[in-house]
Amino acid sequence: MKIIKYTEKEIPDVLDFEKKLRDEEDVWGWEIDDEYIKSVKASFHDGRFNDTVSLLAYDNEKIVGRIDACILPSRFDGSVKAYLDWICVVKSSRHKGVAQALLSELKNKLKEKGINTIIALTASNDEAQRFYKSIPDSERHDTGIWINIK
């Protein structure tokens, strides 16, 4: 397995990965349509995405996992944290250390940027909960809320 930075040239592989996710589990809440693809491509040319860290795990030339985080500076306490936006491994590659390897590499990249804390909203399914409990040096707090801005 190798882990690389997600760049624009990997978009076709990422789309294949997302299709495989849906083939293996029907739990994903958005469609891979033209609008979605257009938004993903545009994100690589939008300065608002400059402080993101996105990594891909490849096995046998196919993406089997992905992790995405963004940097969150806060004047509340003068800290800079990272928000774990997404971590996912295709079902057929789970329980093989892919998610832990992605998280470890993300932590290395964030440490290079002087960031020492990752915050995340957590999925409630049992498999995800087992993963979260396996993360060393972590504490669980509160729950999450999504607020739509209309």
Give the positions of each predicted feature.
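Conserved GNAT-fold acetyl-CoA-binding loop/helix
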Residues: 22-42
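Residue-level recognition of the GNAT/N-acetyltransferase active site
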Residues: 72, 90, 123
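A conserved beta-turn-beta hairpin within the catalytic core of GNAT-like acetyltransferases
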Residues: 72-84, 94, 140-141
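A short helix-loop-beta-strand connector motif used in the catalytic cores of GNAT acetyltransferases and
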Residues: 42-56, 83
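Conserved acetyl-CoA-binding loop-helix of GNAT-fold acetyltransferases
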Residues: 89, 95-108, 134
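Conserved beta-strand in the GNAT
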Residues: 56, 62-71, 83, 88
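A short beta-loop-alpha structural element at the N-terminal edge
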Residues: 2-16, 27
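Conserved active-site alpha-helix within GNAT-family acetyltransferase domains
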Residues: 100, 116, 123-149
